Every structure is written in structure tokens, then in C-alpha cells.
Amino acid sequence: MPRSLKKGPYIEPKLLNKVMVAQESRSKRVIRTWSRRSTIIPEMVGLTLAVHNGKKFLPVFVTENMVGHKLGEFSPTRTFYGHAGDKKTRGK
């Protein structure tokens, strides 16, 4: 269920501070975060955020199309190796 409009989007306060400092200084440094639950806001557009996927940090360059989505949507946590297949050769 989506968050109530009267509450507004959730952004980790520490992450918001880092984003505001990066915007003021026009820094292109990567901002590392564990906060996958934070919503992408327009102030983040143009920044690169390294989002933790449980094992490592994956760089995510934020574009206008990502505004309103969560950071975790762009950092997959699971690796799909394919379904277990039939090991026998198939026909001639």
C-alpha cells in the first residue's frame, strides 16, 4: 500500500543531509547509503548514489524518470542463475 499523501515521501534524514550538501557544493562524489527504503526526490536528480544490496554497493545514477521510486528498486538483491535444466542432450 502506498504512503499517505499528507505524510509525504520518506527520506532517511542522514541521506537527505548528504544530498543537500552535495547539491550546494555541486559535488560529483558518490554518496553511499544503506537506505533502500528512501524515496527518490527531485533534489537527487543528477547525483550518483551507491545503494547497498546486502553484499556490496551498486552505483545508481539518478534521472528524472526515477523520481518517486524507492532506491532499492534499482539495486537488485538476488542473482538469478536460471532454472535447473535437463542435463541430457536433446534429440539429434
Swiss-Prot record:
Quote one Gene Ontology molecular function term. rRNA binding
Which family does the UniProt entry place this protein in? Belongs to the universal ribosomal protein uS19 family.
Presence of the UniProt keyword RNA-binding in the record: yes
- UniProt keyword rRNA-binding, yes or no: yes
What the entry lists under NCBIfam families is as follows: rpsS_bact (TIGR01050)
User: Which GO biological-process labels does this protein carry?
Assistant: ribosomal small subunit assembly; translation
Q: Which GO terms describe its cellular component?
A: cytoplasm; small ribosomal subunit
What is a single Pfam family found in this protein's UniProt entry?
Answer: Ribosomal_S19
What this protein is reported to do is described as: Protein S19 forms a complex with S13 that binds strongly to the 16S ribosomal RNA.
Name the chain's protein. Answer: Small ribosomal subunit protein uS19
Record key words, sorted: Ribonucleoprotein, Ribosomal protein, RNA-binding, rRNA-binding
The record's listing under HAMAP family reads: Ribosomal_uS19 (MF_00531)
